[in-house]
Amino acid sequence: MFIIVLMSFLVLVVPIPLFLFKPRWPLNALIPGIVACAFIRLFGVEYEIRGQEHINVRNGGVVLLNHQSAIDIVMLSRLLREFRNIVPVVKKELFYMLPFGIASYLVGVVFIDRKNTASAKDVMKREAVAITKDHLKLAIFPEGTRHDNDTLLPFKKGSFHVAIDSQSIIQPVIVSKYHFIDHKRKRFGRGRVIIKIMPEIPTKGMTKADVNELTDRCQQLMQTEFDALSAEAKQYCHN
């Protein structure tokens, strides 16, 4: 936990004065992201990204990610260097975790109030417009909460509604299990994180009637890839 807090402080809080020159710009997070990756590498954790050829920066859309730990911030930082126009969607409560919430706001993070359905829908409708107008990609964790299970949690449907409303693409991105984190013994070991960017899934022509089928399709695809990547990453783990 100390490592996570220290890393978050160094990569988000220290650069806040720089973010003020152009607030809410996603690329504000680029330099902190590089620092985050270098910092965690000191602890023996390496990141490998596959499937960069599937990225089309001209396409706005929804990027689906599995959610495991607070150090997902490093994974998001690494993906920013590939996608460049990607912003995470997170629960509003994180905004009030000062000063991290302010830093997150300044790098363009989108906050939603999950307890207020109407408010959350309004925010996502606004972002759906940005997807089309600004070619923005929203990084969404469809499981809704982080966990360290071997089975992904049932996907919530909000991200799929956003993609269909904007008639944009969905791009699944799967992150291997963090075998190097021992939650029971609270130990942080050495290991490798494998991130796989899958081909885009178009939603053009889809309607609300297709949400359930699309959700199930993405859940099955991501679970299959998660199992395979996690098994491969396990051989690099040294706790």
Segments and roles (model prediction):
Residues 1-20, 26, 30, 53-56, ...:
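Membrane-interfacial terminal anchoring regions of lipid-handling membrane enzymes
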Residues 33-45:
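A generic, lipid-embedded transmembrane alpha helix
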Residues 37, 78-81, 102, 122, ...:
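Short amphipathic alpha-helical coupling elements at transmembrane boundaries
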Residues 37, 47-54, 79:
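Membrane-helix interface/capping segments
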Residues 11-29, 42-43, 56-117:
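Catalytic core of membrane glycerolipid acyltransferases/transacylases, capturing the structured
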Residues 49, 63, 88-89, 195-197:
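Generic preference for hydrophobic
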Residues 121-239:
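Non-catalytic C-terminal accessory region of glycerolipid acyltransferases
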